[in-house]
Amino acid sequence: MKHTVTEVRLDNGSRGLLIDVPGATVMSFQFQFRAGNRYVGRKNIYETAHVMEHMSFGANAKFSSEHAYEAEFTKNGAYHNAWTSDLSMVYVADCADFEWDRILELQQVAICQPRFQQESLEAEKGNVRSELTGYLNNHGRVLWPKVQQLLGEDVYTFWQRLRTIDNIKLEDIQRHHRKTHTSDNMRFVIAGKLDGRREQIKSMLESWELPRGERFVVPRDVLKKAAPTLIKRKEATNLTFGWSMSLPREINDAELEAMSCLNHILTGTMHSRIFGAARKKGLAYGMFSEASAGFYDSSWDFGGQVNVETADRLFDIIAREVRAVLDGQISEKELAAAQSYALGRHQMGAQTVAQISNFYSGRYFGDGFVKDYERVPEAIRNITRERMIATAREFIGADTWVLAGVSASDQKSLTRLNDKLEKLF
């Protein structure tokens, strides 16, 4: 879908993107605050941000309860949600074009004028407890926060987070909202048919009842190499594994595009070098690899599930193919195929207003950078074998990594798999 992007900076310190999608019949809203778990005041109330997010659509200045607010918000089919991460709290909504202003007003009252109540707090503490307990039955959810911890990130696992819920008091919720929900800490992306509406939207956002504050700095952790770690689960008859490598700098956009193509070559399809080879031999039903750029560090991750009896053979393939990349063994034919795939996926990724909004929001909420949708094809075509290989070599050269797994197997088996990877460094 054709669209144009304008960045606006409001007098109250808020910033955001207004994305005009001519002819769109849907409006999409996203509002982000640096208000996630890392900004909670004390570790013993770590889950405060998450519980507050659950309470965000409860009683407020205009509605006495969550049920009353929900009934009004959704009466014409509109959707809303919120989510919390280590750094962010994000409020999202989608609605029919004809009611965009009503929905924006309803978001305003929920975000700016909540009336946090003790009854709601107790209910949402129970709901969050149920949510996190459910995650403990998902071995991938159990694994990756532990990987973060092992590398040195100052985060809690879901089990640790569960133990902090009882400590949260109503004043903790109120304090976290006052601290984080300020106009200077707010970023937004609004997408839809905006012709003739931009000034009204800006005026509405300028009137939001948020105090001035600050855009919080992203905390920095010192990352380190860690020993292979097994999370023992007697019910885990296979191995859920994660191999994470860290590089002590933010890789640039060109390097990230190159790593995306490299990961496609390695694990992206049924005919890929690692996943495709494993599937052909019946060794693993599914696995992935991906690279990401953080504020101070970048990561290259491999993960998946494998039966214990076939894990050695899968890791032999992983080690062999990563070694081949380090040795420069990527063909122009493989590069061209990966570029063609990336170009197609890019074009398919802007079919809806929400997809367009999401293309911009992740990066914009992170560091304020406005991606250029039209230049992505050029960036993909400019990917080179040399950049892929050099970036992969830099990850290996940093030697900051860990292998972790969830299984009923033993530590000795995981250490044996780790030894196969160790030879790459």
Language model: regions and residue ranges:
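Active/ligand-binding-proximal structured segments within catalytic/core domains
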Residues: 20-73, 243, 253-266, 274, ...
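Short amphipathic
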Residues: 9, 225-233, 404
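Charge-rich, well-structured scaffold segments of protease-associated domains
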Residues: 62, 67-216, 220-222, 247-250, ...
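N- or domain-start disorder-to-order transition segments that initiate the globular core
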Residues: 1-26
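Short strand-connecting beta-turns/loops that link adjacent beta-strands
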Residues: 22-25, 236-237, 397
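Short, surface-exposed beta-strand/loop micro-motifs that present aromatic residues
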Residues: 17-20, 177, 227-232, 392
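Short, acidic/polar N-cap/turn motifs at the starts of alpha helices
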Residues: 3-7, 219, 229
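Acidic, glycine-rich loop-and-beta core segments that form the ion-binding/anion-interacting portion
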Residues: 236-238, 244-247
